[in-house]
């Protein structure tokens, strides 16, 4: 009987029917019951997600647990924060909601607000004691600032920094907020982070820099910004790979051209002796290969096993690349 009443309660919540909610509660529905058909959400979570302040108030007054968690570890405050329901979030905190609670992935309400760009919610949470430097320690080790940088939420990023967020904090893989912004091409945030002291030379666990992330993703404007601020165009990761190699491998022609114009070494080799041209050859990036050859890349350079760019093209079945290297090689030799 109680289970049936709980179902009636959940349906009344979905319908936002106050009278039906009260009737279900008066008949014995469990106000803190979990809806097993929807990740174990409680009545308060439904109301908080919907932003229905009146129902939230009603549920709390009747004993709803403000810190209950669903099967994913989400609280009512997390639902309100994610969906930008400021009045509900304010009430929940007033009634004792934990602003630093984390879900099963270690994500907090502030992180959710940062992802979604919910500035007023983020401001409220910080004012009420949310830790701006908390990390989602169960997964990536990312901070709210990293989430904001990745999502392109400049106002949130600015707020977090003003409130003491560490601009050079690293996640479990050693990635910084600047690397996240660079990878996603969020120019304004990258500029903000640098202005606030972000280390453009920082490397992650694999030795990748913000510039390498920008190059790999083809984010020309961010790459240009980083270089203008002093980023080393020839910096190498732990495998000896440069930004130009990453750009060449993924066919990011404009970034490759930018890097070369800013001094990237077309002859640089990684730990295996492979060059940017070899990377372009393996992945069949014709335009990038043509650019590299035009800029002086040695088509006869060999890696540690004696492989040349054309041998890589043959090995990976890139017949058009074989043709291009032969044709371009002859042309530039004649010049």
Where do the model's predicted regions map?
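Ankyrin repeat boundary/linker residues
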Residues: 35-37, 70, 103, 136-138, ...
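Conserved ankyrin/ankyrin-like repeat signature
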Residues: 20, 54-55, 87-88, 120-121, ...
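Ankyrin-repeat inter-repeat connecting loop/turn
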Residues: 31-33, 66, 99, 132-134, ...
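Start-of-repeat signature of ankyrin repeats
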Residues: 5, 39-40, 73, 106, ...
């Amino acid at each position: 009987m109680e289970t049936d009443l709980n179902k009636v309660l959940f349906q009344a919540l979905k319908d936002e029917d106050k009278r039906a909610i009260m009737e279900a509660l008066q008949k014995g529905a469990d106000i803190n019951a979990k809806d097993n058909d929807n990740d174990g959400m409680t009545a308060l979570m439904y109301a908080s997600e919907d932003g229905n302040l009146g129902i939230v108030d009603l549920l709390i007054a009747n004993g709803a647990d403000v810190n209950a968690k669903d099967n994913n570890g989400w609280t009512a405050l997390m639902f309100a924060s994610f969906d930008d329901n400021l009045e509900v979030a304010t009430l929940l905190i007033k009634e004792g909601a934990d602003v630093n609670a984390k879900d099963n992935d270690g994500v907090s309400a502030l992180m959710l607000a940062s992802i979604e760009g919910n500035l007023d919610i983020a401001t409220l949470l910080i004012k009420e004691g949310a830790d701006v430097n908390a990390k989602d320690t169960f997964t990536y080790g990312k901070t709210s600032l990293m989430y904001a940088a990745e999502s392109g939420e400049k106002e949130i990023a600015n707020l977090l920094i003003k409130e003491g967020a560490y601009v050079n904090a690293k996640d479990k893989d050693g990635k910084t907020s600047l690397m996240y912004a660079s990878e996603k091409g969020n120019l304004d945030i990258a500029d903000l982070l640098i202005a606030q002291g972000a280390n453009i030379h920082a490397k992650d666990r694999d030795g990748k820099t913000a510039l390498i992330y920008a190059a790999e993703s083809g984010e020309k404007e961010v790459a240009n910004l980083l270089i203008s601020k002093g980023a080393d165009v020839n910096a190498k990761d732990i495998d000896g790979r440069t930004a130009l190699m990453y750009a060449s491998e993924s066919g990011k022609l404009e970034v490759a051209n930018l890097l070369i114009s800013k001094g990237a070494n077309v002859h640089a080799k990684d730990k295996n002796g492979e060059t940017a041209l070899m990377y372009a050859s393996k992945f069949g990036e014709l335009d990038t290969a043509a650019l590299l050859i035009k800029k002086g890349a040695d088509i006869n350079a060999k890696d540690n096993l004696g492989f040349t760019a054309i041998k890589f093209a043959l090995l990976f079945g890139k017949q058009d690349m074989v043709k291009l290297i032969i044709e371009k090689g002859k042309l530039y030799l004649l010049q």
